[in-house]
Amino acid sequence: LLNVLEERDVQIRGHKVRLPLDVILVASANPEDYTNRGRLITPLKDRFGSQIRTHYPLDIDTEVAIIEQEADLSVSADLDLTVPAFMTEIVATVTHAARASQHISQRSGVSVRLSIANEEILVANAVRRSLRSGSSRVVPRIVDLEALPASTSGKVEIETLEEGRDGEILASLVSQAVLAVFKDHVPPDTHRGVVDAFEEDLVVDIGEDVTDDAYVRLLKQIPALEAPVHALLIDEEDAESPAMIASACELVLEGLHLAKRLNKDAAAGRAQFRGRG
């Protein structure tokens, strides 16, 4: 191989055979070799004309574009799938949060494969939830993010001195992403009316078994919720559908909780939001 690359010939039983090949050899390598095998030997490395160090996507938009290009989101023909842009952005932001986390090994790296896998598992969980409820409309919601730690754990290396903190660290990454997307898309001046409604002893339950229509009724019950929901769905094609409204409502409620504007009690796949007063 070394001779072919450099001298374009090879020795066969003492006879030199010319191989004037017009080829280009391109090789890729991971940031870290886990087995200490398969490293490029120095003479071979010397034959490469250039060594190019690439990097992960530097911004969320690029990460989202890769997700949309690479993720396999095919579902059964009798299901109607729509993934809100803000949900895909949350998935991409989880990956960026992992790349900045001191609890995640940056030497091992956090590949874009994490974003792709998380998008696919998010949709898979939404499909499961829709089938259980007997609905053919599939729109991922905040409750579907509970599946992400399982798909994330196998693609990152967690560094912590404390045993059993893996789940907590991964859940924290998801929460960071939800809060970041909430702050980016929901104007602060739309929060006040929603928080005021909860201060009047309003309690709202969410969960996998809560139907899309229940969120439409919630929107009528809390008129102030319409402004932040509209801000999230303003660029969505199917903004008026109950499933899209449900997804946006859950992000608003979860975002307000993470911003310390609402209290939340969670247990057994359900959550209850109430005022902090």
Where are the language model's segments positioned?
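Helical mechanochemical/support elements of P-loop NTPase systems and associated helical scaffolds
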Residues: L21, D33-L40, L44, S50, ...
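Residue-identity detector for threonine
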Residues: T35, T42, T54, T62, ...
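C-terminal engagement/docking regions of AAA+ P-loop ATPases
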Residues: R107, V127-G277
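Generic alpha-helix detector with strongest preference for long hydrophobic helices that associate
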Residues: E6, L21, L25, A29, ...
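Conserved AAA+ ATPase small/helical "lid" subdomain
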Residues: E63-V139
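Canonical AAA+ ATPase core
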Residues: N3-L79, I121-S133
